[in-house]
């Protein structure tokens, strides 16, 4: 009998790759795109909408009983054991500006546990994926988090958006930088989390992130041997949360610096 999680992993990899090809077509013709604002520093293009519709249609065709949560078109209300979470283009600001740092992200949750995560970066032909209990992979090669011994080695990724105040960000960055840390931000939380799983970055922190940006990457980091803050999947899907994840030694050093974020209430924009 075919394992239902393996079936969904295979489908997620195929759908994400095809969605990334579609997104790349839009990226190469982005001057013709209709672009709208969802809020401060938060844009959506026709590419985001059409790529999500493509992914949703593919999931509905293959798994008609599964639930779906998407960044652009929300959540289906039918209860199901399997729920798919979609970010059609993570890094839209980069996408519309012509910066080749964005990705397509699909994850799948089974009875409250993330079991599949796929991130495709078509600009670099990088295909990241993880299956619960079976490891994390980049282009077929098993990933492992960095062996850095502390924040003085390598760079961490830091997420920042309009839901986070500058003062809140500096609560973390000020002591981090004073301890000799270095940080990187590319405006795609999903891609930075994949970089952590691949050992390119040593950790990632954001005071508030949405489920479609992080669930795939958090599974990859877990399967690549990393440490992370525990989270409630349903709460994450409905409201988002603060996250910290990374190489174990770096994670341990960052935990007290990031503790402020556990009680952080994000800014809500109307």
Locate predicted features.
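N-terminal subdomain of lithium-sensitive/metallo-dependent phosphomonoesterases centered on the IMPase/IPPase/PAP
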Residues: 1-89, 264-270
């Amino acid at each position: 009998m075919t394992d239902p999680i393996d079936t969904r992993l295979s489908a997620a990899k195929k759908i994400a790759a095809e969605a990334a090809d579609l997104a790349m077509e839009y990226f190469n013709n982005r001057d013709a795109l209709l672009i709208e604002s969802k809020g401060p520093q938060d844009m959506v293009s026709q590419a985001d909408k059409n790529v999500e519709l493509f992914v949703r249609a593919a999931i509905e065709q293959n798994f008609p009983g599964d639930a779906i949560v998407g960044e652009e078109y929300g959540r289906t209300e039918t209860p199901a054991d399997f729920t798919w979470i979609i970010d059609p283009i993570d890094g839209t600001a980069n996408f519309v500006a012509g910066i080749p740092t964005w990705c397509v992200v699909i994850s799948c949750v089974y009875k409250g546990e993330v079991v599949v995560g796929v991130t495709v970066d078509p600009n670099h032909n990088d295909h990241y994926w993880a299956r619960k209990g079976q490891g994390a992979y980049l282009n077929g090669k098993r990933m492992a988090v960095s062996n850095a011994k502390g924040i003085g080695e390598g760079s961490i990724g830091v997420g920042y958006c309009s839901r986070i105040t500058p003062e809140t960000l500096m609560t973390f960055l000020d002591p981090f930088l004073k301890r000799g840390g270095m940080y990187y931000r590319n405006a795609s939380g999903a891609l930075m989390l994949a970089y952590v799983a691949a050992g390119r970055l040593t950790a990632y922190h954001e005071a508030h992130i949405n489920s479609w940006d992080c669930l795939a990457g958090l599974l990859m980091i877990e399967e690549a041997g990393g440490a992370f803050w525990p989270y409630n999947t349903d709460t994450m899907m409905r409201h988002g949360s603060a996250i910290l994840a990374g190489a174990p030694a770096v994670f341990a050093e960052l935990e007290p610096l990031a503790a402020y974020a556990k009680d952080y209430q994000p800014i809500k924009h109307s």
